[in-house]
């Protein structure tokens, strides 16, 4: 009989960091509120939530790497908003941000103890799309990235219980 491992949304054990880009702050602050609210609703104490702010999404990967290296957090949620303009700037910023956070997430998952890094950076064509995804119409993507983080933290804990690695 195969063994199945799934994450869940039970109250996770450990501390969480939320890394938020200040650029497009009217959007990213809504994402951050959604993330904090989701953690609290899932049993994480205020004292176990730290919020770090950086200038923009391009700076997020470096910040996330520093935060994961502290080994204080079981989960790190990254939040930002890149909105397409009339120049190729969007492509460079969005692409480098995604690659950088992805690389940190890969390293963090392989570390002992494993850490979860989730991606909650909006990449939209218009301001209206970003506003909708920050909670007006299409749900709050900050909350969604946080749910993914909680689920993965709990999955890694279950895996560690069977593979001998420290959660």
Curated annotation (Swiss-Prot):
Segments traversing the membrane: none
The keyword Transferase appears for this protein: yes
UniProt entry keywords in alphabetical sequence: Riboflavin biosynthesis, Transferase
Molecular functions per Gene Ontology: 6,7-dimethyl-8-ribityllumazine synthase activity
Binding-site residues for 5-amino-6-(D-ribitylamino)uracil, renumbered to this chain: 23, 57-59, 81-83, 119
Enzymatic reactions: (2S)-2-hydroxy-3-oxobutyl phosphate + 5-amino-6-(D-ribitylamino)uracil = 6,7-dimethyl-8-(1-D-ribityl)lumazine + phosphate + 2 H2O + H(+)
Signal peptide: none
Residues at which (2S)-2-hydroxy-3-oxobutyl phosphate binds: 86-87, 133
Name of a matching Pfam family: DMRL_synthase
Enzyme Commission number, as recorded: 2.5.1.78
Keyword Plastid set for record: no
UniProt pathway annotation: Cofactor biosynthesis; riboflavin biosynthesis; riboflavin from 2-hydroxy-3-oxobutyl phosphate and 5-amino-6-(D-ribitylamino)uracil: step 1/2
A single cellular component GO annotation: riboflavin synthase complex
Example GO biological process: riboflavin biosynthetic process
PANTHER family: 6,7-DIMETHYL-8-RIBITYLLUMAZINE SYNTHASE, 6,7-DIMETHYL-8-RIBITYLLUMAZINE SYNTHASE DMRL SYNTHASE LUMAZINE SYNTHASE
Function: Catalyzes the formation of 6,7-dimethyl-8-ribityllumazine by condensation of 5-amino-6-(D-ribitylamino)uracil with 3,4-dihydroxy-2-butanone 4-phosphate. This is the penultimate step in the biosynthesis of riboflavin.
Family: Belongs to the DMRL synthase family.
Protein name (Swiss-Prot/TrEMBL): 6,7-dimethyl-8-ribityllumazine synthase
Organism name: Myxococcus xanthus (strain DK1622)
Gene that this sequence comes from: ribH
């Amino acid at each position: 009989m195969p063994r199945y491992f799934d994450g869940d949304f039970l109250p996770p054990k450990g501390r969480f960091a939320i890394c938020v880009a200040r650029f497009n702050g009217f959007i990213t602050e809504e994402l951050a509120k959604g993330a904090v609210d989701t953690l609290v609703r899932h049993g994480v104490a205020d004292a176990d939530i730290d919020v770090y702010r950086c200038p923009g999404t391009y700076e997020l990967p470096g910040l996330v790497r520093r935060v994961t290296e502290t080994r204080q957090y079981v989960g790190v949620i990254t939040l930002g908003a890149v909105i397409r303009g009339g120049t190729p700037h969007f492509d460079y910023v969005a692409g480098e941000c995604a690659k950088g956070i992805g690389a940190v997430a890969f390293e963090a998952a392989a570390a002992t103890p494993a850490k979860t890094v989730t991606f909650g950076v909006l990449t939209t064509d218009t301001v209206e799309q970003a506003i909708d995804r920050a909670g007006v119409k299409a749900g709050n993507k900050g909350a969604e990235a946080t749910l993914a983080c909680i689920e993965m933290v709990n999955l890694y804990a279950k895996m560690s219980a069977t593979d001998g690695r420290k959660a």
